[in-house]
Amino acid sequence: MIYVKYIILGFIMGSSLNLYAANNDIIANKEVIKVEVSNEHLKTLNEASTLLISCVDFRLIDETDKLMKQLGLDDDFDKVSLPGASLALVNDKYTYWGKTIEDTIGILQQLHNIKQIVFLDHRDCGAYKMLVGQEHLDTREKETAAHAEILNKARNLIKEKFPQLKVYTFLMGVDGVVEQIYEDVTLSSVIP
């Protein structure tokens, strides 16, 4: 806290430093950092039951971890984050994202013996706005339908390529409310 105050004082005194550069210097100057291990047993674990595929959005990092804990998967999941989560797997513009997810699943089946995939999409997603289009997301109903269609497409692709894995799909609101999206949702051909 004192260091931050010093940086702010530097601004007040007319220093040419900017907060962004100062923050980067703080990070760059850390050569060794000791991070507290959350659970001692983590050192002995070599399997994770689940791969979580979620969006990169910084707004929901803590909420995502809380969800996984509520699902009983705390300390029992690997994680891949790409823009749009399920959209990353099935979009036509950035196909290498899908390849990355598929390769990761294959590797984690061997390394950690994963048994299931959890896709976690979220509302107000920038990747969906860019790749699906705002016109498909401008009401809550349309947004739910767009996510449901893409989540189900992702589920079907995983089941086709990795039939032994269970797939669960969820949609999180920026308010933290999470809805499970089931296979029987009627699709509306949102994907361009």
UniProtKB/Swiss-Prot annotation:
It comes from the Bacteria. One of its GO terms (molecular function) is zinc ion binding. Keywords: Signal. Pfam families: Pro_CA_2. Residues 1-21 form the signal peptide. InterPro entries: Carbonic_anhydrase_sf, Pro_CA_2. This is Uncharacterized protein RF_0129. The lineage of its organism: Bacteria, Pseudomonadati, Pseudomonadota, Alphaproteobacteria, Rickettsiales.
